[in-house]
Amino acid sequence: MATAYKVLAQQATTASLVSMYTVPASTETIISSIVVANTSASDRTYRITVQPNNATLAQKHYIAYDVTSKANTTTAYTLGITLDATDQVYILGSTTDLSISLFGSEIS
């Protein structure tokens, strides 16, 4: 099995929940870090979900819910989230002023 350490995804938020990352077929992923950067001079909020196997969104899938990101700040989460093929990470922000990055490894 090969392990690729990489930037998994980088995306600006929108006011709608959007898919940020989907684990490729025949692959497992470990998200080691999530970084949220607020590029606005105002506070913003965000949500992050992890949905296994194309599951319909439920309360249990949120790993962050309406978290406030202070103006012009960056928050880094060091994690060890394990994902299976087709699992997805979704994001939502109060505006487009938030940038979210996922870092980790894909094992295939």
What is each model feature region?
Residues N53-Q88:
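Intrinsically disordered, low-complexity Pro/Gly/Ser/Thr-rich segments with frequent PxxP/GP/PP motifs
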Residues V36-A41, S94:
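Short solvent-exposed strand-capping/beta-turn motif centered on an Asx-Ser/Thr pair
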Residues R44, H61-Y65, L98:
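Short beta-strand segments
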Residues K6, T22, R47, I63-D66, ...:
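Compositionally biased, intrinsically disordered low-complexity regions enriched in proline and serine
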Residues M1-T29, S33, N54, D84, ...:
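C-terminal interaction-tip segments
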Residues R44-A55:
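The feature marks short-to-medium sequence segments in extracytoplasmic or secretory-pathway proteins
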